[in-house]
């Protein structure tokens, strides 16, 4: 191995190491905003009746019945503060505000989850087309879908139902 190959390999290895820690770095830099991406995910299982008591009818329809909220109706579309978007059902950290972008679709959109293990993906063949459904890894809540038309660096657009999430603002330290 010559010197140039050795240096190139070292740079590539360093870049890979830095990028593989990116979601954890995002979450840890959010201060007091809750994040649970580094912890093992323990499943939350409830009956339909329990979910109906906990969630509003709209939240239940979207998260448990795989519904879709009307576009441009979520207050989360207008959040531009630093913090974490959590699952409305179980409070698992899902997305950092740092990965949110304006997709002009009417739903909150992100280019990456806060940690890959916090979401789960399934093939969705409903509506006569094949899409990739995104679910909460802890409670299996339907969150939305992911598409391959997002911005750099991932090229992904996690198009989420705002009603399936809640926002936890980063706390300022004095």
Residue ranges and their predicted role:
Residues 84, 133, 156:
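Residues immediately within or flanking Cys/His clusters that coordinate Zn2+
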Residues 1-15:
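N-terminal secretory signal peptides and thylakoid transit peptides that target proteins
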Residues 64-80:
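N-terminal post-signal-peptidase region of extra-cytosolic proteins
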Residues 96-97, 145-146, 168:
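Short, non-ligating residues that shape and space the ligands of small metal-coordination modules
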Residues 22-62, 70:
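C-terminal segment of N-terminal export signals and the immediately downstream linker at the start
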Residues 78-109:
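Mid-length scaffold segments of soluble, non-membrane domains
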Residues 91, 140, 160-163:
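Cys/His-coordinated zinc-binding microdomains
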Residues 87, 136-139:
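Short cysteine-rich clusters marking metal-coordination/redox-active sites
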């Amino acid at each position: 191995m010559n010197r140039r190959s050795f240096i190139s390999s070292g740079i590539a290895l360093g870049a890979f190491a830095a990028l593989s820690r990116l979601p954890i770095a995002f979450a840890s830099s959010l201060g007091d905003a809750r994040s649970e991406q580094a912890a093992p995910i323990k499943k939350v299982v409830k009956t339909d009746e329990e979910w109906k008591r906990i969630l509003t009818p709209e939240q239940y329809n979207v998260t448990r019945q795989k519904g879709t909220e009307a576009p441009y109706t979520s207050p989360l579309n207008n959040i531009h503060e630093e913090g974490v978007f959590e699952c409305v059902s179980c409070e698992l950290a899902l997305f950092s505000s740092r990965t949110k972008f304006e997709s002009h679709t009417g739903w909150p959109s992100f280019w990456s989850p806060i940690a890959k293990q916090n979401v789960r993906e399934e093939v969705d063949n409903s509506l006569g087309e094949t899409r990739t459904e995104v679910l909460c890894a802890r409670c299996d809540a339907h969150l939305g879908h992911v598409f391959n038309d997002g911005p750099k660096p991932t090229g992904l657009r996690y198009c989420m139902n705002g009603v399936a999430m809640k926002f936890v603002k980063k706390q300022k330290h004095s």
